[in-house]
C-alpha cells in the first residue's frame, strides 16, 4: 500500500505526453501526424485508463484502511522562507480522480466519432489530455499555491475548448465571456490565499488548518478580516462552479463541442469549485458567517438555475442551467455542513449529466442531417420531436438520465438529492421548502426537454399531422401544447428556405433534390443533402456504435452508482460504502456519521420527495405531450384556453415568467449596462482625457516652442543692432517685472 501512495505523484503526468507529442509532431512531421491522428485518440484513452486503474486501487485501499497520505518536498530559499510542494491523497482526491478518469474515458471514446470529420481533431485531443492533466494536478495538490496554479490551467483549458471553433463569433464571444467572468473569481481567490498566508504564514493545508484553529481558540485573529479572506476564497468557487452572481458564462459555454460540455459539466471545471469548497471546509467551519454565505448563495443558485431552465429552447442551454441548479444543491449542502451529501451528489450528478450531454450530442448529430449544421437549428428543441422511433438507444439512455436527475428511485441522483433535502430541513425549514420546490421544478424542466425532443412528430417544418387539408396549425409553444395561437405559415423563426440546406462549417448552401422532395411530400420529414457525402436524408438516424457505447456504460453508472451511498447500516450489514470511504475527512471535520437509518423515516421522506418529482413530471407531460398523439379531441384543449379575465391574467403572468426565464432573468443585460457600459464609458473618458489633455499639453509645448523659435529666427537677421535691441527689450521686461514684485513686497509684508 505504501508503494502505491509513493508513486501517486505520477497521476497528473500520465496524460501529459499526448499534447506534447501532438505539438511536436505537428511542428516537425505535420503530414504524418495528421495521417495517424486516430493513434492519438487511442493513446489518450490508454493513458487515462492507466490512471483510472491507479485511482481505483487508491480508492479501494482508502475504503479498507481509511488512510490519508501526504508527501511534501521542501525547497529552502533562506532561513526565513522555504517553498514546499507535494501531493495529497485522501478520500476527496480519490473520488475526484475516479470521476475524472471514468467520465473522461467515456468522453474520449465518444469524441473519436463525434469529431471524426473536424479539422481540429488533433487539437481537440491535445486540449482534452492537457485538461485532464490540469484537473489531476488540482485534486492532488497539497497547498494553496499548487491549487492556484492548476486552477488557472484548468480555466485556460476550458477557455480553449469553449472557443474551440474560434472562427465562429458566438464561440469566440463565449470564450471571452468565460475568461472575463472567471477573472473576477480568480482574483478573489488569489487575494484570499495571500490573506490566509499573511495570517498563518503557511500555504500547506494541514499547517494552515492547525495554525488557524490555534489562533481562533486563542482569539488572536481579526474576525472581519478573516471572514473577508474566506469570502474571497469562496469567490473563486462561485465563478468556477457558475454560482450566482458569476454564473453568466456557463450557458454561453455551450458553443464548444458537445463532448466538452459533458466533461466540463460532469467532472472538471464546474466540479473544481465544489472541490475547492470541500477541501477548505475544515477552514470555513470555524469562521463566523461564512457558512451562512455559502448556503445562501447555493440556495439562490438552486432556484435561479431551475427557473431559467424553464423556457430555454436550446437543448444544451437547458442542460447547462440544470447543471447550475444541481451545483447549487452541492454548495447548499456544503454550506449547511453536509459534507457527505455534497460529495455524494457530486458523484451521482456527474454520471447522470455526462449521460444527458452525450445523449444530447447524439440527438444533435442526428438532427444535423435534417436541418443543417447550424447550432441554432440542430440544437433547437422546437424543431425536434418524434425522435423515439429513429434513435431508440439514445432516447432510452436520455430518459434514464432525465429520471435520475428528476430524483426518481432507484436511479443515482435520487439517493443523493434526497439526502440533501433531508439535511436542509434540519438546518432551516425555509431553505428546505425552497429546495423541495426546486426539486419539483427540476423534474418539470427535465421532462420538458425530454418531451420536446423525443415525443410526438418531427416539428422542423410544422407538418400538418391531422390528415385533413384545412385543419388549424397549432404552435409548438415553449410553455406546452395547450397554446391555441395560430402560427403563420410564413413563420421565419429558425426555418430554412424550402430548397436550401446550410452547413455549419461553410457559408455555402446546397440545393435539395426537388424530385425527391415531391416524392416524400407526405412524410413528416424534410430532405437535405448531407454536408460530407451529398447524400439526401429524409429522417434522423441513430449514432454509430462508438458514440452509443459510452452512453450504455454511463447508463450502468446511473443505475448503480447510487448504491455506494445507501445509508442503511443495519445489524450484520454495512451497505454505506461512501461513509467508509469518507471516514478520514468526516473525522477531520469532527462530524458524526449516522450509525443507522430508520426505514420509516427514510421512506417517509423519500415518498414526499418522489411525490413532488412525479407532480413535476405530470405537469410537464400535461403541457408538452403532443396534442395530435394523445389528445385527439381538440375540444378538450379548448376547455383550457377559454377566454376571460382570469385567463387573460393567467396568460399575462405566464408571458412575464416566460420572458424572465428566456431572457436569463435580465441579468446579462444588467451586467452589460452597468459593468460593460460603465467600463466602456470610462475607457472613452480616459481616451478623451489622454488625447485632449495629456497629448494637448505635450503637443502644445512643442507648438509653442516651434513658433517661439520661428519668431526668434525672423527677429535675428544677422544685424548686431537687432540683437542689441532684442537683448535690451528682454532685460527691460525682466527689470519691470522685478520692480513690480519689489514694490508689491513693500506694501504687503508676508
UniProtKB/Swiss-Prot annotation:
One of its GO terms (biological process) is electron transport coupled proton transport. InterPro entries: NADH_UbQ_OxRdtase_chlpt_su5_C, NADHpl_OxRdtase_5_subgr, ND/Mrp_TM, NU5C-like, Proton_antipo_N. It is a multi-pass membrane protein. It comes from the Eukaryota. It catalyses: a plastoquinone + NADH + (n+1) H(+)(in) = a plastoquinol + NAD(+) + n H(+)(out); a plastoquinone + NADPH + (n+1) H(+)(in) = a plastoquinol + NADP(+) + n H(+)(out). It is found in: Plastid, Chloroplast thylakoid membrane. The chain crosses the membrane at residues 9-29, 40-60, 89-109, 125-145, 147-167, 185-205, 230-250, 258-278, 283-303, 327-347, 354-374, 396-416, 425-445, 548-568, 607-627, 724-744. Keywords: Chloroplast, Membrane, NAD, NADP, Plastid, Plastoquinone, Quinone, Thylakoid, Translocase, Transmembrane, Transmembrane helix, Transport. The keyword DNA-binding does not apply. One of its GO terms (molecular function) is NADH dehydrogenase (ubiquinone) activity. Belongs to the complex I subunit 5 family. NDH is composed of at least 16 different subunits, 5 of which are encoded in the nucleus. NDH shuttles electrons from NAD(P)H:plastoquinone, via FMN and iron-sulfur (Fe-S) centers, to quinones in the photosynthetic chain and possibly in a chloroplast respiratory chain. The immediate electron acceptor for the enzyme in this species is believed to be plastoquinone. Couples the redox reaction to proton translocation, and thus conserves the redox energy in a proton gradient. This is NAD(P)H-quinone oxidoreductase subunit 5, chloroplastic. It comes from Tecoma stans (Yellow bells).
Amino acid at each position: 500500500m505504501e508503494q502505491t501512495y509513493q508513486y501517486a505523484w505520477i497521476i497528473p503526468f500520465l496524460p501529459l505526453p499526448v499534447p506534447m507529442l501532438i505539438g511536436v509532431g505537428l511542428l516537425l512531421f505535420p503530414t504524418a501526424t495528421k495521417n495517424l491522428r486516430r493513434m492519438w485518440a487511442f493513446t489518450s484513452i490508454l493513458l487515462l485508463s492507466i490512471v483510472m486503474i491507479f485511482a481505483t486501487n487508491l480508492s479501494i485501499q482508502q475504503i479498507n484502511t481509511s488512510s490519508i497520505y501526504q508527501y511534501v518536498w521542501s525547497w529552502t530559499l533562506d532561513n526565513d522562507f522555504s517553498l514546499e510542494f507535494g501531493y495529497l491523497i485522501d478520500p476527496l482526491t480519490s473520488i475526484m480522480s475516479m470521476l475524472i478518469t471514468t467520465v473522461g474515458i467515456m468522453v474520449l471514446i465518444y469524441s473519436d466519432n463525434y469529431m471524426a470529420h473536424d479539422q481540429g481533431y488533433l487539437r481537440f485531443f491535445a486540449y482534452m489530455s492537457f485538461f485532464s492533466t490540469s484537473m489531476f494536478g488540482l485534486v492532488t495538490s497539497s497547498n494553496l499555491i499548487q491549487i492556484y496554479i492548476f486552477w488557472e490551467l484548468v480555466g485556460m483549458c476550458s477557455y480553449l475548448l469553449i472557443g474551440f471553433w474560434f472562427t465562429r463569433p458566438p464561440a469566440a464571444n463565449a470564450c471571452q465571456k468565460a475568461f472575463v467572468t472567471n477573472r473576477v473569481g480568480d482574483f478573489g481567490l488569489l487575494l484570499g490565499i495571500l490573506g490566509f498566508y499573511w495570517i498563518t504564514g503557511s500555504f500547506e493545508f494541514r499547517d494552515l488548518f492547525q495554525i488557524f484553529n490555534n489562533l481562533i481558540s486563542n482569539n488572536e485573529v481579526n474576525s472581519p478580516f478573516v471572514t473577508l479572506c474566506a469570502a474571497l476564497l469562496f469567490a473563486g468557487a462561485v465563478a468556477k462552479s457558475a454560482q450566482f452572481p458569476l454564473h453568466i458564462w456557463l450557458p454561453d459555454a455551450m458553443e464548444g463541442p458537445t463532448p466538452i460540455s459533458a466533461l466540463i459539466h460532469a467532472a472538471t471545471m464546474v466540479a473544481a469549485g465544489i472541490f475547492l469548497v470541500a477541501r477548505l471546509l475544515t477552514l470555513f467551519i470555524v469562521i463566523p458567517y461564512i457558512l451562512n454565505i455559502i448556503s445562501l448563495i447555493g440556495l439562490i443558485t438552486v432556484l435561479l438555475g431551475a427557473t431559467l431552465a424553464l423556457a430555454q429552447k436550446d437543448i444544451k442551454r437547458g442542460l447547462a442551467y440544470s447543471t447550475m441548479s444541481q451545483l447549487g444543491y452541492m454548495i447548499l449542502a456544503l454550506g449547511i455542513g453536509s459534507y457527505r451529501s455534497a460529495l455524494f451528489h457530486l458523484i451521482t450528478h456527474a454520471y447522470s449529466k455526462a449521460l444527458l450531454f452525450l445523449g444530447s450530442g447524439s440527438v444533435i448529430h442526428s438532427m444535423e442531417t435534417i436541418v443543417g449544421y447550424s447550432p441554432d437549428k440542430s440544437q433547437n428543441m422546437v424543431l425536434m420531436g418524434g425522435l423515439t422511433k429513429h434513435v431508440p438507444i439514445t432516447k432510452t439512455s436520455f430518459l434514464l438520465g432525465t429520471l435520475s436527475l428528476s430524483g426518481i428511485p432507484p436511479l443515482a441522483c435520487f439517493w443523493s438529492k434526497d439526502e440533501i433535502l433531508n439535511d436542509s430541513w434540519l438546518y432551516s425549514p425555509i431553505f428546505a421548502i425552497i429546495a423541495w420546490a426546486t426539486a419539483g421544478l427540476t423534474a418539470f424542466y427535465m421532462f420538458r426537454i425530454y418531451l420536446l425532443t423525443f415525443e410526438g412528430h418531427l416539428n422542423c417544418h410544422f407538418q400538418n399531422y391531422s390528415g385533413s387539408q384545412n385543419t388549424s396549425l397549432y404552435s409548438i409553444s415553449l410553455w406546452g401544447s395547450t397554446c391555441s395561437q395560430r402560427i403563420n405559415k410564413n413563420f421565419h423563426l429558425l426555418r430554412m428556405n424550402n430548397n436550401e440546406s446550410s452547413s455549419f462549417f461553410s457559408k455555402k448552401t446546397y440545393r435539395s433534390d426537388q424530385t425527391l422532395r415531391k416524392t416524400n411530400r407526405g412524410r413528416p420529414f424534410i430532405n437535405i443533402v448531407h454536408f460530407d457525402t451529398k447524400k439526401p436524408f429524409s429522417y434522423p438516424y441513430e449514432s454509430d456504435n462508438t458514440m452509443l457505447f459510452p452512453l450504455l456504460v454511463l447508463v450502468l453508472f446511473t443505475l448503480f452508482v447510487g448504491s455506494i451511498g445507501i445509508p442503511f447500516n443495519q445489524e450484520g450489514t454495512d451497505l454505506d460504502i461512501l461513509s467508509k470511504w469518507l471516514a478520514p475527512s468526516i473525522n477531520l471535520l469532527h462530524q458524526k456519521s449516522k450509525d443507522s437509518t430508520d426505514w420509516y423515516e427514510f421512506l417517509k421522506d423519500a415518498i414526499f420527495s418522489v411525490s413532488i418529482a412525479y407532480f413535476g413530471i405530470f405537469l410537464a407531460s400535461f403541457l408538452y405531450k403532443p396534442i395530435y398523439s394523445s389528445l385527439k379531441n381538440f375540444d378538450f384543449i379548448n376547455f383550457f384556453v377559454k377566454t376571460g379575465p382570469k385567463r387573460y391574467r393567467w396568460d399575462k403572468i405566464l408571458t412575464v415568467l416566460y420572458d424572465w426565464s428566456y431572457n436569463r432573468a435580465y441579468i446579462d443585460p444588467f451586467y452589460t449596462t452597468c459593468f460593460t457600459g460603465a467600463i466602456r464609458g470610462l475607457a472613452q473618458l480616459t481616451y478623451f482625457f489622454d488625447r485632449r489633455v495629456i497629448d494637448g499639453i505635450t503637443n502644445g509645448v512643442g507648438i509653442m516652442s516651434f513658433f517661439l523659435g520661428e519668431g526668434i529666427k525672423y527677429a535675428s537677421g544677422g544685424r548686431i543692432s537687432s540683437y542689441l535691441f532684442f537683448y535690451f527689450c528682454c532685460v527691460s521686461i525682466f527689470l519691470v517685472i522685478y520692480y513690480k514684485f519689489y514694490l508689491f513686497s513693500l506694501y504687503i509684508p508676508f
